[in-house]
Amino acid sequence: MKILKKVLALSVISLSLSTFSLSANADCGKARLADFDWSSANIHTAIVAFILEHGYGCEVEVTKGSTTPIMAAHYDGQLDIVTELWYDNIIANYDPVEAAGVIRNLGINTPDSQQAFYVDRTTADKYDLKSVLDMNNPEIAALFTDPEDPSKGRMTSCISGWTCYTVNYVKQRVYGLDNFYTNFDPGSGGALDAAIA
């Protein structure tokens, strides 16, 4: 009898929540989501789109593009939701718009995501590479020869058009690495994944 009461109570609670949810869903309308051309953004956008469509009955429209035009559309109110972005790449544009209350940051969905120049542990240990400045050496650059420009090493960068491509280009110049390395554009997110795997 106790089990039956628990099941009945849970059913009533579930039914009331469903009723509340259904009445809330009626006013959902259209949700305009942004998506980018990298895998983690794709999965985050797909999950949010699924929840909005199937959980709240929203009509979902997804617009895919690169950071600059997508964020400009978001700032202008043409897009409602951006599920993932690389904040460090857009601070100068993002902060004033957020401070003005035009957009709201709801938190971090992928903690500890970092942008940096990486070298595998074996190579770093063997050549005592502890800082990006240790890469500023022609003998070290020769370890990473760029097949398209054998006079330099290759630093695999982001895709041309991604903000981080420009960030990496500037970092190479500031650190003096452009004398020894190319800022290699792998051409696609999949090729970038393969290059760093």
Residue ranges and their predicted role:
Residues 102-157:
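A conserved helix-loop-strand patch within extracytoplasmic ligand-binding domains
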